[in-house]
Amino acid sequence: LKQGRFDDVTVYGSDPVAMVKDFVAAGASYIHLVDLDGARTGTGYNQDAIKRIIDTFHIPVQTGGGIRNMRDIEEKISIGVSRVIIGTAAVDNPDLVKEAVKIYGDKIAVGIDAVNGMVATHGWEKISDVSAVRLCNQMAEYGVKTVIYTDISKDGMMIGPNIETTKELIDKTGINIIASGGVTTMTDLEKVDKIGSYGVIIGKAIYQGALNLQEVIQRFEKK
């Protein structure tokens, strides 16, 4: 998707397992999966594909999209997901996050996707009145250890990440921030690394060949 728009989609392959095989061959040790159908509708359509990936490669997988209640979380954990990302529900039902963290600890992460500093929900189709910084601090109070922060205006555009807001979240919350959206070059990765990001999610830049995953891993992955 470009900037989260479901009417601007590029499909890079019809077989997620084959795609992940290439990532693993390049040295990937953690896979980020988003159920875009689930994010939009609140129903996990791609459970079987996620399970096939986990069963095939036996490496940690984090996944989000359509996680709206405890049953959704339990289903993901039961098929072997290492980290479940709660997005929309963190705004609409923050008590779910609090309850989930009590049960599953650091297996729970929160996805904060923002436009102009305000959190977007429901597959990025609704803009809330909650700021990214405020939600991040609230989630930290609930015991969340990891937040995936996406600047929607950057996502899929290959124009570089939002370093300023990512740094603000790191500095003001003190929790692990994984940067997402717009990362395209080694210079982008150096900037994200320099501000103290816990990690980074790269998608389109790999699919389109702007970044070589093996080179990225060799240079930046912490042992």
Predicted regions and their residues:
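Conserved, mostly hydrophobic/aromatic
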Residues: F23, I31, K76, V110, ...
